[in-house]
Amino acid sequence: MYSNSNSFLGGGNSMRPGPQQYGSSFNAGSGQQQQQQQQQQQPPQQSPFAAQQTGFAQVPLQHQYTGYPAMQQPMQTGQIQPQYTGFPGHQQGFQGSAPPMPAIPQQFQHQFQHQQQQQQPPPQPQQSASFLSSQPTTSSSLQTPSAPAAAMKPQPTGFSQMAASFQTGGQSAPKPAQASKGTKIPNIRLSFITAQDQAKFETLFKSAVGDGQTTMSGEKARDILMRSRLDGEYLSQIWTLADTTRSGQLHFPEFALAMYLCNLKMNGKSLPSSLPENIKNEVSSMVDIINFSIAEDSANASSATNAPDFTVRQNTATPPTIQHPQPQPSNSQLLQAQMTGFPGAQQGFMAQANGGGLQPQQTGYPGMQNPQPTGYTGPRPPMPPMPTGLGAGGMGAMAAPLNAQPTGRPGQWGLVNTPSTGLPNIDALHARMMPQQGREQGSFTTAGLQGNAVIPWAITKDEKTRYDALFKAWDGMNKGYIAGSQAIEIFGQSGLEKPDLERVWTLADHGNKGRLNLDEFAVAMHLIYRKLNGYPLPNSLPPELVPPSTRNFNEAIGTMKNMLNQESDFRKNSGAALLPQKTGVSYLKTHSFRGQGGVPTGSRKDATVFKNDDDAVGYKSSARRRIGNGSPRPDSPSSVASNEDLSIEQLRKKIKEKQVLLDAMDFKDEKSFEEDDVLDRRDRKEAEDLYRRIRRIQEDIDSHPDAPLPSGDSDAERRALKRQLQNLKDSIPDLASQVRKTEKAIFEARLELFRLKDAKAHPSSAPAIVGTGPGGAVTESDRLKARAKAMMQQRTAALTGKKIDISSEDTDAPKRLEEESIQARTEKENNERMVRDVEESVQEFARSIEDSLQAGGQTADNEHERRRWEDALGVEDEIRDFIFDLQRSSRSKRVRAQDRRADRSGPTSDPPRSEPASAPRHESPSAPAARTGTPTSASSAGGSYSSYKTPEERAAFIKQQAEQRMAERLAALGIKAPVKGGETPAQRMERERSERAAKLRQAEEEDARREAERQARLAEEQGPPQPAASAPKTEAKPPPPPPSRKAAPDRETAAKKAEEERLAQEQEEQQRQMREMEAKAKAEEDALARENSAAEARLKALEEQVRQGKLKKEEEKRRKKAALAEAKEKEAKLAARRQEIEAAKRREEELQRQLEAMNEEGSSSDDDEPAQITPQASTPTVGSQELERKPSPPPQVAEPKTESRNPYFRMLSQSSEGPTSVSPQASVSPVPQQEAPAPAPPPAAPEASTNPFHRMTAPQTAAPAPISRKRADTDDGWGSDKDDDEDDSDDDRPGGTSAAQLASILFGTMGPPRPLSAADNKSVSSPTAVASPPTVASPPPAPPGPPPVPAAAAPTVPSTPSPAPEITSAPPAPPPPPPPMPSMGAPGAPPPPPPMPPTGAPSAPPPPPPPPPAASSSSAPAATPAGGRPAGFLGEIQAGRALRKTTTKDKSAAAVAGRVLD
């Protein structure tokens, strides 16, 4: 079984070149003994132990410590020492001296010392000799122990486990580095996963199992594998495949296999039913390596030791007890340098826990334990103990491991199984040899590839698999060979020398072809692998390495030569060469390459029985094919028997057969022709059916109401839509910038308005300098004006000797201004944010529209299909004619439909325009929102817009309306509107359902309308003939019975009869013509109905869209007009407020001048002013208003002219019809609405009247009178924005007027009591006179209406809100006329000036307003009699005195007020 069975006796090893195979020698000591004997016989030898090469050929070779460092006793000379050949239970001491013992090397000293420390032997009798027999170095003299010789360096033998079995005990920590144990995973590359994946799996495995563990429990593996989210069935199958040991735990290779199978399944591949052979072998081999390494570690780490303690044991009488060797695994991987000798006196080998050990056996008799002479007295080396008995386990002591051996006959190519020791470094070699980047620049060495593995001559299966994969990786073109240039690159990566590679190529390249096939490449790689593991290259290939292809080819050539030679000799010797050769004789049995004259296994033919077949041709020309393969090919003349050999009967029979065949062929042809005819007719019928269906579908397309307008070029339409969309997108930034400018202007105007209101509400806290810059900022001109004013006041005070009244500073004014500024700025930012949101939404909507337009564009495939089926390119002639015919018919129907639509558009286009205009004239003014049709939807839209209170809601409503309009336009153009991202599927389904229902209703309405029109048309067509036919009947029946006629009754009767016949004939002719006309009309009507079914529906839809577009355009125009009117109205309000303040100040100054009698002309001019206003505002205010309160409908007559289509104006009309505070000019035209608010400051009015939303819900009953409208028209120009602009001139500057005028203006500040009362009267009375204009304003600007300033007027206003409309309906009065309400002294009229309602003023307590205005208002009646002159002046004003020079005073009144810059 073993090639070195005599190794125990020191016999020679295997004769094969190279080192021995693993397990070839039990112990290196057998060879060492002979060498030691030879060395001891040499006189110069100082030590019997010399350096021996006992292990594998590794560089460098180190000395092996083979001695026994026991305490040697001197032995007596002259005696033959016995040899220790067995395992005696008791050994007598040997006399004599032992040879000198070398020192223990340093690398084994710690091991030896550790063994001595652990050794605790039982007390034993002292013996005079050690376990090893000592041999005297001389024959006569007693030798003392000589000095130890040079230490022998340990030599690695490759048998770490075997050496460990002979050690007297295990050591707990052979090396300090082994103290900390981790998870050991062999450095072996798995072929079925990549290196990166294997590294990741190693990391995952180590982190899961922890240190010191080599297997993963089932729970941990389940947790990891469950992360793949595979089905439990698949995971169970993966576990079954991966757990190769069936232990319920996974080693690392099994875990890697499980991860590989999981990845395989996750990628969609199926799991194998069983593992492939290569994967199974790799996993099993690696698992065995891991398990064996664990056993080795446990053996080394065993605590129970039996090593002698050299520090205690000196001379013991009892011999040591020999420990049995421990059976070790055969495939140890970790080769370490081990001590091959016994480091001390042996106490015997103890049985190990891993199996029954070998029991000590005595080889001699128990009494024969004394030294025996051996016949040789020369020096002998110490012989180690040799186990000769058999243990309980039935194993020989330390038997050599079993290696895989080729089982076939010698020299036969075959793939053997992988040796149990594995193939170390084969993966590293395979990885290096694979094609990879950067291999051209690398210099390769044998580092990492060398080893001392035992490799058989034959190639193993694992090797062959790797070599084949490597060959296929390099043979990318599948040429089947590797060229010499590639071989240089591949083999050069092994790092071998060039001569070695040349020998490898010479051995592998059989026949010197210059290239290697698959088998030859495997041979070359195997030789390289053997060379890397220390084996020399052979001079010629052994039989095990000869590839089958080479061997079979050579054998085939030789066999062929032998056959030819034998055949030639046989023919020559037998004379067969002179005979004709028989070509039908088979030589297969004798000329077979496979068998030696055996019977062939199959029906295989060789060349010896070849017979040519003329019918079996390999090529047939296409011209020689028969149609349908119906006619058989005539036989070759060579194969047809000669007709000469046939008899007459046979010839007749053949003729009859041929005739039958011909008849059958004719019948088959007829049948196939009939079948083809049937198929053709069926195909034609189907084609006609398809033609009809296509025509019907085209007609449906042409008549469908939702069909897009056919313009002939959809691309042109799409480009036009894109251009239009781009223009609209370009206009968005411009609109946004305009909105931002408007917001900025509103912000500045709001601040300016607040300043004016605050100055009016808090006169004492008015700032000394009023800013006229942007946003109310104080400019240098304002400072100059204020300085000039102060100097003038000082001069006036110095001239008059009066004290200057310096108003106290109000610290709350800046705070109020700052709060208002923050509020206005916040609102401005919110509006700008909404504008940005709207802009972004519009941009997004535009992008979606653009994408939809782009998606509908022509692609290459669409263009190809369009050119094929619309332009009829690349189709059959019949289909091309059909396409053109279809296009012509469709075009003609379209033209007729357009003509009819054009004819109907004339009479039908006017009523839609007249209906909306005429309908409002007949409806009652109390229900303007009850209109039907399109105005209803517009009204509802407007109402919904006005119902939104916050700007965010209005912005969202505007965005929704814009998207709806755009969707309608896209639907009209045949483009599907994009679905909004925020719309849920349920909402989309509901919307689509409602759209379908609406379309269905519209289609039904269209059908009903068309039916009614058709019936009407038929009635019109049938109407004229029926009276004509009935008239003769009615006329013919009365004449026959007249009995009164007496002259020639027979003649008359004949004439009447002839007449009746003629009339009957005419009637029949007319009826026939009528029937023909009816039939013709019906046919025409049917044709028209078919042609116009969809055109009329589309016409109505288009007309509706056009009307909607016109309405929307008108609505947008009115909206723009309303916005312009609103802006102008705001400017007019600001101007009116400025004029009011200016007028109040002028009035105060004029009253002061009157009291002081300084300027009589100024007082007379002031007296003229109220006189002019009194008849305008006071007289008609109550009289005409009370009388004309009921006839409210007349003002509504002219309203629909401008508001019939605009929902926003209708909402305003609804809110303005009820309240009485609305000025009548609101229903006249947009122009009066813009001019009316000029003199009206809304902030001073009560909150109930300035809020438009509050007015909509307030219970107001009266309506303005037309006379007051006229007065308002006359007064509008007085306070218009134009006049205000004209008033602003250079005269406003202090330097623009004379010093005398400035002095006269400033004199008014000297009288504190009266200015306060006058200012209070003005501030209280002026809002009452101008409270109506805010009601005319549109809803949007209404929210900022209620500022804090109106609180000054609160004492009198909130007490009686219901009668307030009656007084506020006199807005025509200009700002200066607070007293023109003499007739309103009634207690129910709070707004009139304080002098008039002394009872009403105190009756209303002032709730929230500041105390100064309330005090001044309450003290006004008391101040009137004190002065006397103010009462007289007011009396004059009440009497009707008018102020004639109002315009002159207005021009010179803007000195102390700011204005809004354009």
Swiss-Prot record:
Task: Give yes or no: UniProt keyword Cytoplasm.
Answer: yes
- Biased composition of type Acidic residues is found at 1275-1291
Q: Where is this protein primarily located?
A: membrane
Name this protein carries in UniProt: Actin cytoskeleton-regulatory complex protein PAN1
Quote the biased-composition stretches of kind Pro residues, using this chain's numbering: 1336-1350, 1371-1414
Chain ranges of the EF-hand domain: 230-265, 496-531
Instruction: Give the source species.
Output: Pyricularia oryzae (strain 70-15 / ATCC MYA-4617 / FGSC 8958) (Rice blast fungus)
One GO cellular component term of this record is:
plasma membrane
Q: Which residues form a coiled coil?
A: 643-745, 815-847, 986-1023, 1050-1165
Q: How does it sit in the membrane?
A: Peripheral membrane protein
Which stretches of sequence are listed as region Disordered?
Answer: 1-60, 80-183, 302-331, 591-645, 806-839, 884-1462
Q: What's the subunit arrangement here?
A: Component of the PAN1 actin cytoskeleton-regulatory complex.
On whether Oxidoreductase is a keyword of this UniProt record, the answer is no
Report keywords, A-Z: Actin-binding, Cell membrane, Coiled coil, Cytoplasm, Cytoskeleton, Endocytosis, Endosome, Membrane, Repeat
